[in-house]
Amino acid sequence: KKTQTSKEAIVERVERHFTWKWGPGEVTLQHNPSFLDNGRVLLFDNGSHRRAPNTNYSRIVEIDPANNDIAWDYRGEPAISFYSYQISGAERQPNGNTLICEGATGRFIEVTAGHQIVWEYINPLFADSGRLAGGSSSGQANSVFRAHRFAPDDPALEGRDLDPARYGNLNRILGAN
């Protein structure tokens, strides 16, 4: 049986013990933890089932495992304006900004270290997803599990036709130029 422990940890595999633990109590139902070049851990804290009075909101946290301090965080203003009860992720970009996928609502944003939103995109594609999926009472959702930004010179793009004219009909349907 798998359980969500609302805990982050670093495990030393050979000796089979934790070298670092953070939680429970600090985050709830988090996703997408990743190590940053500075040794810190970045993750999406979904915030589901957070205890009152600090109820439903999500945030991105950058934790310093050396002292368990939150070195940086991002949350909505007001807090409930940024909430994804499931899925989602965050990825630090080479320029220091953070790419965020607010998964349940299909929203992508890039924010600066100073919390300024540089750009925003909302997935325009909705599909049948079952009752209450993505926070929708209609059963239609535009949820997205995660986002990743590829650099123009990324080897994964080598030899691929990325000419937007090739996808003209799709771009017109979705309202892109």
Protein language model regions, located:
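Histidine-/acidic-rich catalytic cores in large beta-rich domains
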Residues: 1-177
